[in-house]
UniProtKB/Swiss-Prot annotation:
Compartments in which it is found: Periplasm
Species in which this protein is naturally found: Pseudomonas aeruginosa (strain ATCC 15692 / DSM 22644 / CIP 104116 / JCM 14847 / LMG 12228 / 1C / PRS 101 / PAO1)
Signal peptide: 1-27
Physiological role: Binds primarily proteinogenic amino acids.
Chief location of this protein within or outside the cell: periplasm
Family stated for the protein in its record: Belongs to the leucine-binding protein family.
GO cellular component entries: outer membrane-bounded periplasmic space
GO biological processes: isoleucine transport; L-leucine transport; valine transport
Name of this chain's protein: Amino acid binding protein
Pfam families referenced in this protein's UniProt entry, alphabetically: Peripla_BP_6
Entry keywords, A to Z: Amino-acid transport, Periplasm, Signal, Transport
Length: 374
């Protein structure tokens, strides 16, 4: 699809709302916060918005960006690619954003980033891990997270070297993110000498996976790896347990929300579930004061909250470092300078990937909470 097609005829699909952090007269630096603010994955959108809002408030209180205030614009893509392109056009054409924090689902980030590239603005995704996000040569696309080909290695290593599994079922949701991560994990399993006993896709939005569970049972899998998001992971693990399957269930950073226990039907179903995610940013000393501020306000900064906060910090540092609110100059600055964030020091390579990835394994308890394993 040509880039021009991204910019025409689809603005009517946009679903977005504008929320400023200051008066219009002072809100000169417009930054979009794009992600699933509605729909099944809205909990991730809330994490994005909470993190970005607190960061913008703190940065504005300290003088803003080159003396100007940040104004945030909420852009809801519902993790739907067509809607993502629509809101990207809205951010560029109507809201005049010069930077974006987003999107969440890789299948949304990839097409939306073409719009941003054509418009010459900079974007940082806190959570899109598919390698193609940064493999297309876009000059202004960055991540605050790792990549699936890094995360899949960690998952595969853990399944083979720690769980000692010989029979592994690999399940995915047929989406760019979920299937890409499942394939990366499968590749690592195969590299370590373990051939999957089942490789199967499910459909996002479905809730009845009993037929799939029957296939998993027949495969004799000791571990079930699922590449996808919590709205499907929850019902899948519950139906496994209801059918008496005791195989370990492992997933990814698409389930890093307390909503996993809700979609599973209760915390008892997610006890023992494993997942890969970056090292818990709430434990990093650099972010202690910010974490305490969130908690004092009654919000637990789980998942991608601090990733979003750090993304706003990095954009502010880049514009300030460049000495102008010029996205191209900010992107070049970010590729050659480290930024101290609530998640510690971050540095990017020329593609926009972090130079250091820190994926680890977490386990869910019987209270529906996840904890980083040593």
């Amino acid at each position: 699809m040509s880039k021009k097609l991204f910019r025409k005829g689809i603005l009517a699909l946009a679903v977005s709302s504008v929320m400023g952090l200051s008066t219009h007269a002072l809100a000169d630096v417009v930054i979009g916060v794009a992600g699933p603010h509605t729909g099944a994955n809205a909990s991730f959108g809330e994490q994005y918005w909470r993190g970005a809002s607190q960061a913008a408030e703190d940065i504005n209180a300290a003088g803003g960006i080159n003396g100007e205030k940040i104004k945030l614009v909420k852009a809801d893509d519902a993790c739907e690619p067509k809607q993502a392109v629509a809101v990207a056009n809205r951010l560029v054409d109507q809201d005049k954003a010069i930077a974006v924090v987003g999107h969440f689902c890789s299948s949304s980030t990839i097409p939306a980033s073409e719009v941003y590239d054509e418009a010459g603005i900079i974007a940082i995704t806190p959570g899109s891990t598919n390698p193609q996000v940064t493999e297309r040569g876009l000059s202004g696309m960055f991540r605050m997270c790792g990549r699936d080909d890094q995360q899949g290695v960690v998952a595969g290593d853990y399944i083979v070297n720690v769980l000692k599994a010989k029979k592994v079922a690999v399940i995915h949701d047929k989406d760019t993110y979920g299937q890409g991560l499942a394939d990366a994990t499968r590749a690592q399993l195969n590299k370590l000498g373990v051939k999957e006993v089942l490789y199967e896709g499910l459909t996002r939005g479905e809730k009845d996976f009993n037929a799939l569970v029957t296939k998993i049972r027949a495969s004799g899998a000791e571990v079930v790896y699922f590449g996808g998001l919590h709205p499907e992971a929850g019902p899948l693990v519950r139906q496994m347990r209801e059918q008496g399957l005791t195989a370990r269930f492992m997933s990814d950073d698409g389930v890093v929300t307390d909503e996993l226990a809700t979609t599973a039907g209760g915390p008892q179903y997610v006890k023992g579930v494993l997942m890969t995610f970056g090292a818990d940013p709430r434990l990093i000393p650099d972010g202690k004061a910010v974490v305490e501020k969130f908690r004092a306000g009654g919000f637990e900064p789980e998942g991608y909250t601090l990733y979003s906060y750090a993304s706003i910090q990095s954009l502010a540092a880049a514009f300030n470092g460049a000495g102008a609110n010029d996205p191209a100059k900010a992107a070049e600055w970010l590729k050659s300078h480290p930024v101290q964030t609530v998640m510690g020091k971050k540095e990017w390579d020329k593609k926009g990937d972090l130079k250091v990835s820190d994926y680890v394994v977490y386990e869910w308890d019987d209270k529906g909470k996840y904890h980083q394993l040593p």
